[in-house]
UniProtKB/Swiss-Prot annotation:
NAD(+) binds at D79, G80, N153, E154, D183, T194, A195, Y196, S197, L198, S199, A218, N252. InterPro entries: ATP-NAD_kinase_N, ATP-NAD_kinase_PpnK-typ_C, NAD/diacylglycerol_kinase_sf, NADK. The active site is at D79. Keywords: ATP-binding, Cytoplasm, Kinase, NAD, NADP, Nucleotide-binding, Transferase. Its EC number is 2.7.1.23. This is NAD kinase 2. GO terms for molecular function: ATP binding; metal ion binding; NAD binding; NAD+ kinase activity. GO terms for biological process: NAD metabolic process; NADP biosynthetic process. Involved in the regulation of the intracellular balance of NAD and NADP, and is a key enzyme in the biosynthesis of NADP. Catalyzes specifically the phosphorylation on 2'-hydroxyl of the adenosine moiety of NAD to yield NADP.
C-alpha cells in the first residue's frame, strides 16, 4: 500500500534543497508518495502589500495534494519556514516534522546531525503530536474581509518605518476598550511569547496556556504594559493614526492597514500539529536555545 507524505522546503536555501532530495529518496524507498512544495506558498501579502484580498480565506494556503490522506509533512528550513508551513498544514490537520537547516531553530524538532534517525522514527510511527494553538488575523473594512491569515506566533502592527508614535484603541471581549500610544502593538500566542513579544518586554508563556498576550512596542506611558487574557475573547484593534500602518504576521505575511480598517484577532479552530520524536520539557528548551535560567559561571568577588 502506498502511503503519502508531504515535503515543505525553503527553496531559497541550497542546504534545504539538497537535504530535500535525500529525504524524498528515503521516503520513496519506504513506499511513500511524496508531494513536495515550496514554503513560499504560505507567505501571504508581502509581494504586493496593497493587494489585500485572499478570496478563499486562510485555507487557500493549503497546497494541492495536502489532504486527509497525508500521514505527515516534513519541513526543511529555519523558524520562518516553519511559520509559513503552519499555514499550509494546519487547516488540513497534517502533522509536521520540523528539521532545522537554518540558524536558531527554536521550533525545530530535529537537525541535520540526527536526520537519518529522525526519518527512521517517523516511518515506523515512533512519534507523538504536540498541538500548538493559533490565531486568525483578519483585516476588516466595514463588513468586508480584505485580508486574512493564520498566525502561529504573533501579529505586529506599526508604522513604516518604525520611527514614530501610533495611537490604538483596542477592544478585548466585553472589557472596556484600551487606549495605547506606542511605536506599535503585538498580539501573540503562547508559542509567540518567545519571539518578537519577548524582545518587546512581554512575558514567556508556556505553550499549553489558553491565552493571548498584548504587548506594546516602546510604549509612551509607564501605565502601558503587557496584558495576558483568555484566548476565547476576540480582539479588535482600531488604528487611531491618520497614516497607513504595516501589519506583519509571523514575520513573513502581512499587508497595509489604513485608518478606515480594523484588525480582528480571534482564536483559530485549527491547531498546528508538531511531531515530537522525544519528550521536550519547555523550560529545558528555553535553557538550551535562549540561555534562560543558566547559572552564573563567574560571580564578582566581594
Amino acid at each position: 500500500m502506498v502511503r503519502k507524505a508531504g515535503l515543505i522546503v525553503n527553496d531559497g536555501k541550497e542546504l534545504a534543497v539538497q537535504t530535500a532530495i535525500s529525504v524524498q529518496k528515503k521516503l520513496e524507498k519506504s513506499n511513500y508518495e511524496v508531494v513536495r512544495v515550496s514554503s513560499s506558498g504560505g507567505m501571504v501579502g508581502f509581494a504586493n502589500p496593497d493587494q489585500h484580498v485572499r478570496p478563499l480565506g486562510y485555507s487557500n494556503c493549503v497546497p494541492e495534494g495536502f489532504d486527509s490522506s497525508m500521514e505527515f509533512a516534513i519541513v526543511l528550513g529555519g523558524d520562518g519556514t516553519v511559520l509559513s508551513a503552519a499555514r499550509q498544514t494546519a487547516p488540513a490537520k497534517i502533522p509536521i516534522l520540523t528539521i532545522n537547516t537554518g540558524h536558531l531553530g527554536f521550533l525545530a524538532e530535529a537537525y541535520l546531525s540526527n536526520l537519518e534517525e529522525a526519518i527512521d522514527k517517523l516511518i515506523i510511527g515512533k512519534w507523538d503530536i504536540e498541538e500548538r494553538k493559533s490565531l486568525i488575523i483578519s483585516v476588516m473594512r466595514n463588513e468586508q474581509r480584505r485580508w486574512e491569515s493564520l498566525c502561529l506566533n504573533e501579529m505586529a502592527l506599526h508604522r513604516e518605518p518604525l520611527t514614530s508614535m501610533c495611537h490604538f484603541e483596542i477592544s478585548i471581549g466585553r472589557h472596556a476598550p484600551v487606549d495605547i500610544s506606542a511605536d506599535g502593538v503585538i498580539l501573540s500566542t503562547p508559542t509567540g511569547s518567545t519571539a518578537y513579544s519577548l524582545s518587546a518586554g512581554g512575558p514567556v508563556i508556556t505553550p499549553d496556556c489558553p491565552v493571548v498576550q498584548l504587548t506594546p512596542i516602546a510604549p509612551h506611558s509607564l501605565a502601558s504594559r503587557a496584558l495576558v487574557f483568555n484566548d476565547s475573547e476576540p480582539v479588535t484593534v482600531f488604528p487611531a493614526t491618520p497614516e497607513r500602518l504595516v501589519m506583519v504576521v509571523d514575520g513573513n505575511a502581512g499587508c497595509y492597514v489604513w485608518p478606515e480598517d480594523r484588525v480582528l484577532i480571534r482564536k483559530s479552530k485549527h491547531s498546528v500539529k508538531f511531531i515530537r520524536l522525544e519528550d521536550h520539557e519547555f523550560f529545558q528548551v528555553l535553557r538550551n536555545k535562549l540561555g534562560w535560567g543558566l547559572p552564573h559561571v563567574g560571580k564578582p568577588n566581594k
